[in-house]
Amino acid sequence: QFGKIKIQSHNQLELLETETFTPIKFFVEPIILTINYLEKNYDFNSYHMVGISGGGWTTTLVAAIDERISQSFSVAGSYPMFLRSDTKNFGDYEQHNLELYKIANYLDLYVLASVGDDRKFIQIFNMHDPCCFGGTAFEEYEDNIIATVKTFDNGYFKVYLDDTHREHEISDHSLEIINNEIIS
């Protein structure tokens, strides 16, 4: 409908949106297809997923829709829309796609990623992240998600705050948290 365009950022993906296609597929489908391939060709007992920033957002979404991901870890990945007044937290096209979030908002996704047999969803935020989702705003929803997950009698949700550095990264401290959660 627009002719040829050169996509140079996530925000321009909205130009590809049609009634029958969503670019959200570019984020989700490769992971689902990979898990399908692994299940067909190997005999793994479980799947875990870790992502930072846009990868943390992808981790949240994919874990919410595919229960085969038993443990998922989103580092500096997302806040609910009501906590995104700071422009650095608003995110790219995929993080505020209204059609997607009419189906399930962020709080719904956090619960969906958490519940189920042997399922766990962990968010890690960097206290002094220069990019996005730094600080303690998660405290606005953390207890509500924990309480909601408990009503399902199976599943686990937790948030960690990493104050050991001032970068937009998965620090050694966060890696230790992830490792400890996986083996616990």
Which residue ranges define each predicted feature?
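Cap/lid segment of the alpha/beta-hydrolase catalytic domain
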Residues: Q1-E29
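Alpha-helix capping and helix-loop boundary segments enriched in small/acidic/polar residues
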Residues: T18, T22-K25, V50, N97-A104, ...
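Structured alpha-helical segments in the cores of large, soluble enzyme domains
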Residues: F27-N36, L109-V115
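Non-catalytic cap/lid and distal C-terminal segments of serine-dependent acyl enzymes
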Residues: P30-N36, I65-E67, S74, E167-S184
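Primarily recognizes the serine-hydrolase "nucleophile elbow" in alpha/beta-hydrolase
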Residues: I32-E94
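Flexible loop/turn segments at secondary-structure boundaries
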Residues: G56-T59, Y79-L83, D129-F133, H165-I170
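The feature captures the conserved acid-bearing segment of alpha/beta-hydrolase catalytic domains
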Residues: P80-D153
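C-terminal catalytic histidine-bearing segment of alpha/beta-hydrolase fold enzymes
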Residues: N144-S184
